[in-house]
Design a protein with these regions (language model features):
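C-terminal recognition-helix end and immediately following basic linker
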Residues: 694-707
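Conserved pre-motif C helix in the palm subdomain of viral-like polymerases
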Residues: 198-229, 244-250, 274, 323-357, ...
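Arg/Lys-enriched, amphipathic patches
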Residues: 1-78, 117, 121, 134, ...
Length: 707
């Protein structure tokens, strides 16, 4: 087949390629359509982890750590394979074995929770089945090379054997060495110097069987500690996600603007937070959280004696022991970190001093009735200080002095718990009270001044000190444009893919990036217009429509069977509002939606637009009664049906209105052309004549510009 001098063989090769190509195109089309459906479902369910995993699969593998890297001093570039492997092993060893400790005095200050001895009970068959079901397929396994698909297809017989294995591990109080060890691969972060090890992210490949046991432990641990974690912690907890904290942050900004108060928010960055957790201190904190010794010993066993090695293109470095930090790549790691971080926050802030007092009421006439908060009874009072997502921490305060005191307390607690605040990456966002011009604040950590910024990207969404989403819209368009560009050759220009599949990929990859966290936005008409213009431009490129064809926007939307951005925004926000309404009253997003500050007053006259104003307008556009919407939203199925019906009617009304306006413009133009002889459109400034009024209109703008 490779003999190029043989014409018959070359013809056979061409024929084989011709036969194979349609089959490969069909397979790719089917795979992309399925992956796009999965991404869209994850996006609709606010499962951000699954969204990003799907996006990575579509984009393909990222650059790994096989390229030349700088030595530890940063003075020489290493190109030899063995030198590169040794450098990565050295880098990993330095990161994963940083010494840290937690003060015994700080641990003793934490309250003791009653021991939950039910955690010590041996695992059951149902728990093993649940752990297997939670496994993610398509993931690289550890050193044993047994993928998750094998366990998922094993059936009852394998479940029984695994239950026996896990029970014996439970009785021994120690896990096998294979369950502990990790193989580390490095992926470039797509920012910074590609030759610097610091700009790569380490991924730990672990034994799938060990992951199942860790998942079993996690399921039990979550049931026990969920009520012990702060309400503001939304990282890696069921029913919570990044949208909760982005929404909370925007609501804090709006409430302070509405009631003419200033607010300070410090976004705290911790240096290698997961890798610097003191293990000995963590076990003691777990005891304080009511975790019994036997269960704690099993968790410890996953960490103590752990060996790791670096893998690059099939080559493996010498193994080294990992003595510090929670086990990266293990499902237990985020929860173990949250336990330690929760203990640190309790130590830093034992009371509500310097927090933000709020009052709220979820009954009394609904969200849009302000008088409900004037009642002397049934009004709840609370406080807001921190917004958390794993190790992402945003501290809020009402004054510069309160912010400084809070940072002093947090800094002292971090030092006591072995954590380090990154001065370079920690930033302050100051939102001054309306119609004031205050001086730039000075917030310090250990005598070093923190940078004050006008905007900050928090959990992927840009917050601005002026409480508008202009910069967020710019950022979203930039990210969506990059996503669209990355798929140009692999999807948009590929002839073997159907239009239906391309549209599915566009929805999952581009629209998801464009409208990320849009459910939390307070939207003005100008934002809708800019976003919709980008949306339609992408669809025109996808359909290969040229501007000379004069295809109206309505036809573009009808061809692709996609709604406009204004419809999508209203739909996202109303669905999110229903989700918030169904939350328990103890949840922070719900409290902030229904609350007002305990201090401060609204200005007289027209108020600046708020999220609930956007929400109310969306309800009216969708034909939903603003006075009774909460009753409908209490039922998820009924609410979604109402929102979907409203979206369909609103989009059709937009299309009909646009068509009517276009027809009216054409009729006017035709009438003018009939009544006015050719060449009689004359410029008043320079006497130039035109055959059509549109030419005169375009020409007249040159005089406006020159003036």
């Amino acid at each position: 087949m490779n003999d190029k001098t043989s014409q018959s063989k070359e013809d056979k090769l061409k024929e084989a390629r011709k036969t194979l190509k349609p089959k490969l195109d069909a397979m790719r089309d089917k795979w992309l359509a399925k992956k796009a459906d999965d991404i869209q479902l994850a996006a609709d369910s606010n499962h951000s982890k699954d969204v990003y995993a799907g996006i990575k699969a579509v984009y393909g593998p990222q650059s790994s750590g096989s390229s030349p890297v700088l030595n530890q001093e940063g003075t020489a570039l290493l190109s030899d394979k063995k030198d590169i492997l040794d450098r990565w092993a050295q880098h990993s060893n330095n990161i994963l074995n940083r010494p840290s400790s937690i003060s015994d005095e700080a641990i003793e200050s934490l309250p003791q929770v009653d021991m939950n001895h039910s955690l010590d009970h041996p695992p059951t068959t149902k728990e093993v089945e649940k752990a297997i079901k939670a496994l993610s397929v398509g993931k690289a396994p550890g050193a044993d090379a047994i993928p998750a698909e094998v366990f998922k297809a094993g059936g009852p017989g394998l479940v029984s054997k695994l239950t026996e294995l896990f029970s014996s591990v439970w009785a021994a109080g120690a896990v096998p060495q294979d369950f502990k060890d990790a193989s580390i691969v490095y992926i470039y972060k797509n920012k910074g110097n590609r030759n610097s090890c610091d700009n790569y992210r380490g991924i730990s490949l672990l034994s799938i069987a060990g992951k199942m046991l860790a998942r079993l432990l996690l399921n039990r641990l979550l049931d026990h500690i969920d009520y012990l974690l702060p309400e503001s912690q939304c990282g890696f907890r069921a029913g919570r996600g990044t949208a909760d904290m982005v929404f909370a942050a925007r609501q804090v900004q709006e409430k302070f603007q509405e009631q003419n108060r200033e607010v300070f928010t410090t976004f705290v960055d911790l240096t290698k937070a997961f890798d610097t957790v003191s293990r000995s201190g963590l076990w003691k904190i777990m005891t304080k959280f009511g975790v019994p010794d036997k269960f704690s010993a099993l968790v410890r066993s996953f960490h103590e004696g752990m060996q790791a090695s670096v893998s690059i293109d099939g080559d493996v470095s010498e193994s080294f022991e990992v003595t510090n930090g929670v086990k990266q790549g293990c499902v237990l790691a985020p929860t173990l970190f949250s336990i330690m971080f929760s203990g640190m926050l309790k130590n830093a802030f034992p009371d509500d001093e310097d927090s933000i007092p709020i009052k709220w009421r979820t009954d009394g006439g609904g969200l849009f009735k302000l008088s409900r908060l004037s009642a002397k009874k049934r009004v709840h009072h609370g406080h807001v200080r921190d917004l958390l997502f794993a190790d992402d921490c945003a501290l809020n305060a009402r004054s510069e002095e309160a912010m400084q005191r809070s940072m002093d307390k947090l800094s002292a607690a971090c030092e006591a718990f072995g954590l380090t605040i990154s001065i370079k990456k920690t930033e302050v966002l100051h939102q001054p009270a309306p119609k004031t011009n205050p001086e730039k604040p000075t917030i310090t950590v250990k005598g070093q001044c923190l940078q004050t910024v006008e905007s900050f990207t928090y959990l992927g969404s840009t917050l601005s000190s002026n409480v508008v989403i202009d910069k967020e819209v710019e950022s979203r368009i930039a990210k969506a444009s990059a996503a669209f560009g990355r798929l140009r050759n692999s999807v948009w220009e590929r002839k073997g893919l159907t239009l239906k599949t391309k549209i599915k990929v566009y929805q999952a990859m581009v629209l998801t990036a464009l409208l990320y966290a849009s459910e939390t936005w307070t939207v003005y008409a100008r934002h809708e217009k800019i976003l919709n213009r980008f949306h339609l431009n992408c669809l025109r490129k996808l359909l290969h429509i040229k501007w000379q064809e004069h295809i109206p926007d309505t036809e573009v939307l009808e061809r692709t069977k996609l709604p406009s951005v204004p419809t999508l925004l209203r739909k996202n926000q109303l669905r999110w509002a229903g989700h918030v309404v169904r939350m328990d009253d103890s949840r922070l997003p719900k409290q902030l939606l229904y609350c007002e500050l305990a201090e401060g007053e609204r200005s007289l006259g027209r108020q600046k637009k708020r999220f609930k104003d956007t929400l109310k307008a969306g309800m009216k556009d969708f034909g939903i009664d603003p006075d009774s919407w909460e009753n409908t939203a209490a039922n998820r199925t009924s609410w979604r049906s109402s929102v979907n019906r409203g979206a369909k009617k609103y989009e059709q009304a937009r299309i009909d209105e646009a068509k009517m306006k276009r027809a009216l413009r054409k009729s006017r133009s035709s009438s003018n052309d009939t009544q006015t002889p050719a060449g009689s459109f004359k410029c008043k400034s320079c006497s130039r004549t035109f055959t059509h009024h549109l030419g005169l209109f375009s020409h007249s703008r040159t005089h406006t510009t020159s003036n």
